[in-house]
Amino acid sequence: MTRKTLAIEGLTATTVIDGQQRVLVDNLSLGVQRGRILALVGASGSGKSMTCSAALGVLPPGVTASRGRVTIDGVPYAANALRGRHVATIMQNPRSAFNPVRTMRDHAIETLQALGKLSSNPQDQIVHCMRAAGLEDVKTILSLHPFEMSGGMLQRMMIALALLSEAPFLFADEPTTDLDLVVQLRVLELLEKLVEERDLGILLVTHDMGVVARLAHDVAVLDHGRLIEQAPVMDIFQTPGHEVTRMLVSAHLSLYGMELNA
């Protein structure tokens, strides 16, 4: 059976610095399949997060997506039609994504309103998604403000809000950053479970090759905004083809006193 695929095609994003045009994402194409996790890796500043922002039309001021499109099974979608309905997002710093003066219930209701999915009795929808995200004491959590919650709880709540959209694809930008190792593992296990149970397709932006090894099916490597290598995860770790990929894998292995075979 053919899996539904989200394809980023020929994406280019540029900015102007000191009167000179600078390319931040350079004619990038890649595909994310439902039921699989594609890790987007590279050094800091390689264009990982910018790729997601450009694909979803949420670029910072001064940056323009000058070319490219996003399709699902060959059908092109405008960025505003993708966001929420077809692609949900979770961010690397969940604390900054929540309004500090509003409760988790407020955030859930606002999410449903923005998606046009608010029913007369939304409680069941909210509870179901929170439990799917591993949050059990739902009544208490819904009454909390962001400052009353740990980073791990906020990340799970962000995942729950993403699940409210029922989108088939998820862009996860550094979802384990600033979390301790135990919480990191729980978040990774949760994402893996959601892929299996909900057939989610995930584009996982990360600099952590340990996360890649644990979670990804496939890996795309960026360097200065260009896609330089894409392969199944085992091939990336065992036989990386590009020098930049070799450097990333070697640096990861050196943390454990290991070396990449020549």
Curated annotation (Swiss-Prot):
Tell me which residues bind ATP: G42, A43, S44, G45, S46, G47, K48, S49
Q: Please state where this protein is localized.
A: Cell inner membrane
Q: Does the keyword Cell wall biogenesis/degradation apply?
A: no
What is the top-level taxon of the source organism? Bacteria
Name the UniProt key words of this record, in alphabetical order: ATP-binding, Cell inner membrane, Cell membrane, Ion transport, Membrane, Nickel, Nickel transport, Nucleotide-binding, Translocase, Transport
GO CC term (a single one): plasma membrane
Q: Name one Pfam family in it.
A: ABC_tran
Q: Which GO terms describe its molecular function?
A: ABC-type nickel transporter activity; ATP binding; ATP hydrolysis activity; nickel cation binding
- Record-annotated ABC transporter domain positions: 6-249
| Membrane topology according to the record | Peripheral membrane protein
Q: Which reaction does it catalyse?
A: Ni(2+)(out) + ATP + H2O = Ni(2+)(in) + ADP + phosphate + H(+)
**SUPFAM superfamilies linked:** P-loop containing nucleoside triphosphate hydrolases
Which EC class does it fall in? Answer: translocase
E.C. numbers: 7.2.2.11
Gene3D superfamilies reported for this sequence: P-loop containing nucleotide triphosphate hydrolases
Member of which family?
Belongs to the ABC transporter superfamily. Nickel importer (TC 3.A.1.5.3) family.
Q: What function is annotated for this protein?
A: Part of the ABC transporter complex NikABCDE involved in nickel import. Responsible for energy coupling to the transport system.
Question: What does the annotation say about its assembly with partners?
Answer: The complex is composed of two ATP-binding proteins (NikD and NikE), two transmembrane proteins (NikB and NikC) and a solute-binding protein (NikA).
Its recorded name reads Nickel import ATP-binding protein NikD
The scientific name of the source species is Brucella abortus (strain 2308)
* Taxonomic path: Bacteria, Pseudomonadati, Pseudomonadota, Alphaproteobacteria, Hyphomicrobiales
Annotated gene: nikD
